[in-house]
Each structure stands twice: as structure tokens, then as C-alpha cells.
Regions:
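Nuclease catalytic cores that cleave nucleic-acid phosphodiester bonds
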Residues: 2-11, 17-136
Length: 136
């Protein structure tokens, strides 16, 4: 997925979950929890990224309670107060301002979001690349 141990990876959970035709629409919170568990395992691998931020929106926010989620080690879960895309842009902008040299990768297939975060210096990959890393 990302080869740099200093990297920040920001995941558009709604977009990634929506890319799998596995019935996610029947239980958005459950689908988000499954993705969080998979990402947690990936984040804890020795060659995983330094930091993984997962942005949840809408009904998927019920996948977590509060800020502390010990079952999802290695992840920072952000529950978007409004638009998930806006929350992702805020995370990327803050990270770029804090350390302009840190590699930032956003996982999404949303063309509008890709344009917004690339303008801030982030690299983007599609959900399939992330899911291939999870499934391997």
C-alpha cells in the first residue's frame, strides 16, 4: 500500500467500504467496523505506515464510541461532524502544515476529493490498492 514508515495514510472509509459489493448498505456501521479491524491489522505490520487516519461519516460513525477505541490499535478514527470529504481535507491540511515534507496518501476514488487533497500536496490511491494490501 505505502512503502514509507513516516507516511500518513488517510482513508475515506465511505468510499472504500462502498467499493466492495458485499452488502455493506444493509449495515453501514458493521461494514465500517470490519474495515477498521482490517486496517488495524495492516497498520500494525512492521512495514505499515507510521500513522493511519480513518474518517467515518453518517451511519458508519456508530462503528466507534468516543475517541478511545482499543480494538482498533494503530488507527486514529475521525468521526466527521459534517461532510467526510471536508474532514479528510482538514486532516490533510493540518498534517501538511505541521510537516510539509511528510508523505501523505489519501485512499479514495472520489475525483473531487482527489483534486482537493492533491492541491494540498497529498498523493492519492484508489480503494482497490488498499484492499489488495488487506487481502494479501
Amino acid at each position: 500500500m505505502v512503502d514509507d514508515r513516516t507516511a500518513l495514510v488517510v482513508v475515506d472509509a465511505a468510499n472504500v467500504v462502498g467499493s466492495r459489493p458485499d452488502g455493506w448498505w444493509r449495515d453501514r456501521a458493521g461494514a465500517a467496523r470490519r474495515l477498521l479491524a482490517e486496517l488495524s491489522a495492516l497498520a500494525q505490520q512492521p512495514d505499515g505506515p507510521a500513522e493511519v487516519v480513518v474518517v467515518l461519516e453518517g451511519a458508519a460513525k456508530a462503528a466507534v464510541t468516543g475517541e478511545a477505541n482499543p480494538e482498533f490499535r494503530g488507527l486514529h478514527v475521525v468521526s466527521a461532524k459534517g461532510s467526510g470529504d471536508d474532514a479528510i481535507v482538514e486532516v490533510v491540511a493540518a498534517a501538511a502544515e505541521e510537516d510539509g515534507d511528510r508523505p501523505i496518501t489519501v485512499v479514495t476514488a472520489d475525483r473531487g476529493l482527489r483534486d482537493r487533497v492533491e492541491a494540498l500536496g497529498a498523493h492519492t490511491i484508489g480503494p482497490r490498492r488498499l484492499l489488495d494490501g488487506i487481502d494479501s
